[in-house]
Curated annotation (Swiss-Prot):
GO terms for molecular function: 5'-3' exonuclease activity; 5'-flap endonuclease activity; DNA binding; magnesium ion binding. DNA binds at R47, R71, E156, G229, D231. Residues 120-251 are annotated as: I-domain. It comes from Kluyveromyces lactis (strain ATCC 8585 / CBS 2359 / DSM 70799 / NBRC 1267 / NRRL Y-1140 / WM37) (Yeast). This is Flap endonuclease 1. Residues 1-105 are annotated as: N-domain. GO terms for cellular component: mitochondrion; nucleolus; nucleoplasm. Mg(2+) 1 binds at D34, D87, E156, E158.
């Protein structure tokens, strides 16, 4: 799930922290990708024309392998060096979110049994998609044969991605989960592994710009996310993104906010703090996540194991041999090039002051309002 409405809040309050990029922009960059999130996308999106998942002769799904193979090739073609990070065991506190997902799953299964229209059946089937251990195992085998590094995190994949980015092992963490920002990755990329056919630009979030423009510390930003609701606990019921930001800026911490609620200094019939709220434990998971220290992680991009790759993808999984061989050549070509020095690596970029960031944020907001106003006028015409 990530953090509810956080992307909307940043888009409205700090639009200058989000850049829309073409994939070519990231040539020469190393990126740590949330593999579990990517596999989930592939299982939903990579399908036949009738909406059914791809499968081999044995009837087992192969959508995850096709997505992993071709989306990785696309990145390699554009000079990006991807590494994938897989989820480990979820933290105990995540049981809250997992229980919610289980209830939603049971509800969807009941609706699927009652569905009669094909479109409705496919919609419910997609909602039931789940990344299973064997999907992860096959994806890891594929990556090994392709020569692409991967890491199995002790717990949350996005936390491990952020750890690699913070240390400079990679340029950015790539995930659809906005809670990646709470783990203090310098840069978050969204939509990196989306299909090219969707024509969605890659979103680049600059964490420092977000923190500085909102004038929040990392701890306060995490508290903001917890107010909105995260994977580890419920948020304050009835509080939307604008009021969540007001609360944290006015009171400074969740402890102070909870105290004000308990004393009756903050009162709203629509707002309610969850009973037995474990916000401190949730905050600790963001501040001190269970990760492998980056100095213990070695990332190596190697020559693909051509014969073994053909054996696995063609003979075992039924993929077209010519296409797999073509993919192997693309891998060889892309990985030989290496990570070239980018022009911006020769210059030290001075961080902007809070005043400069505030001015940039105001300009971006004004531009957004003007664009929205023009759109309304055009619709009237």
């Amino acid at each position: 799930m990530g953090i509810k409405n956080l992307a909307t809040l940043i888009s409205e309050q700090v639009p200058n922290a989000i850049k829309s990029r073409d994939i070519k922009y990231f040539h020469g960059r190393k990126v740590a990708i949330d593999a579990s999130m990517s596999l989930y996308q592939f299982l939903i999106a990579v399908r036949q024309q009738d909406g059914v998942q791809l499968a081999g002769e044995d009837g087992e799904t192969t959508s995850h392998l096709m997505g992993m193979f071709y989306r990785t090739l696309r990145m390699i073609d554009h000079g990006i060096k991807p590494c994938y990070v897989f989820d480990g065991s979820p933290p105990e506190l995540k049981k809250y979110e997992l229980d919610k997902r289980k209830v939603r799953r049971e509800d969807t299964e009941a609706k699927l049994k009652e569905a009669t229209e094909q479109a409705e059946i496919i919609k419910h089937e997609r909602r039931l998609v789940k990344v299973l251990p064997w999907h992860n195992e096959e994806a890891q085998k594929l990556l090994s044969l392709m020569g692409i590094p991967y890491v199995v995190a002790p717990a949350e994949a996005e936390a491990q991605c952020a750890e690699l980015a913070k240390s400079g092992k990679v340029f950015a963490a790539a995930s659809e989960d906005m809670d990646t920002l709470c783990y203090q990755t310098p840069v978050l990329l969204r939509h990196l592994t989306f299909s090219e056919a969707r024509k969605l630009p890659i979103q680049e979030f600059d964490t420092d710009v977000i923190y500085n423009t909102l004038d929040l510390t990392q701890t306060q930003f995490i508290d903001l996310g917890i107010i909105l609701g995260c994977d580890y606990c419920e948020g304050i019921k009835g509080v939307g993104p604008v009021n969540a930001l007001k609360l944290i800026k006015e009171h400074g911490s969740l402890e102070a906010i909870v105290e004000k609620f308990e004393n009756g200094d903050i009162s709203s019939g629509r707002w309610k703090i969850p009973e037995g709220w474990q916000f401190k434990e949730a905050r600790d998971l963001f501040m001190q996540p269970d990760v492998i220290p980056s100095e213990e992680v070695t990332l190596k991009w190697e020559e693909p194991k051509a014969e073994e790759l053909i054996e696995f993808m063609v003979k075992e999984k039924g993929f077209n041999e010519d296409r797999i061989k073509s993919g192997i050549e693309r891998l060889r070509k892309g990985l030989k090039v290496g990570v070239q020095k980018r022009l911006d690596s020769f210059f030290k970029i001075q961080p902007k002051t809070k005043e400069e960031l505030a001015t940039a944020a105001k300009k971006a907001k004004d531009a957004k309002k003007k664009a929205a106003a023009k759109g309304k006028i055009a619709k009237r015409r």
